[in-house]
Amino acid sequence: MSGGAGSASGRKLTAGGTTGEPADEPLDQPIDEHCRRRPAEPLRPYVAWYTGYRQRGVPPARHRGLPSPFLTLIFTLDEPLVMLAHPDPRQPPGDFGALLGGLHSAPALITHDGAQSGIQVALRPLGARALLGLPAGELAEIDVPADAVLGGVCAELRARAVAAAGWRERFAILDEILLRLAGPKSPRMPAPDIAPEVGWTWRRLLACGGTIQIADLAAETGWSGRHLTSRFRTEIGLTPKAAARVIRFDRARHLLARQARSFSGAAGMAGGIGGTGGIGGTGSTGGTGYRLADLAVTCGYFDQAHLAREFRALAGCPPSQWITEEFRNVQAGAWLFEGA
């Protein structure tokens, strides 16, 4: 669920985090911050990054949690995470103190009333067995209370994170607890090895941005297409074709967002967001933004119409609408657009 709990769009803290939130912040001063850090070195095969977010006194908002190549683990530090809609529409809305979500091919819808804080962990699908004790495939297209999988670790982590002095300490707590889960003294049963062909296929898809033909993947593994699809879906949660689609979309929307962030600082912003000269539009942007036709070619779509259809299917809206909805994040360079 890319983008996680919110759309923190205010001050961006350093990669190392802060030693603590300022003690003298005015009570009526809006707070809107985020902080990102990579996990400890031994965790990097399993975890891509941590993001801390804190908002107070900001306008209530809704946010789209978009498909991405990562499982999502969120620990709130105050108010529950309010899910208005899950990727699977059959799953009812709900509130979560800690949420774990698998790979998905449809957007989620998250809301807050102007106050939220928490930590998002981006989990690599091939690391799910080591950290969660189950394959990523068991979480495909669903969100679950994280304690249903991780048990009492969730309560421990949340309690310690709430009491911590700041983001640096919270991320250190995450490192400690996740290393405990993945380490040799973990109470979990040893994770069975993932078939090399499955791991290779996932890494190949990531490396090519989801543009390789599935028949070529099967030929390279030496498996039949049907066998590869079955084994891959069991482990990862999506078929190779669906995974390629998500990876391709994730690349496209990040390129679009990065260009929009750059474009927002350009003088004039001719055409504006979604206009004929602006981000998401069809005309020239003078090098400061992507035309959708160019973006489609770069990311391996047949044409602009193909990209637009895929965006509607995976984001629930056209590219221009998504950029418009998230533009305050683009202006601030929020964590939503930095690998989320």
Give the ranges of each region predicted by the language model.
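Alpha-helical bundle regulatory/interaction domains
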Residues: 1-225, 235-242, 254-266, 271-274, ...
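DNA major-groove recognition helix of helix-turn-helix
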Residues: 232, 244, 311-312, 323
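Hydrophobic side chains within alpha-helical segments
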Residues: 306-307, 313, 329
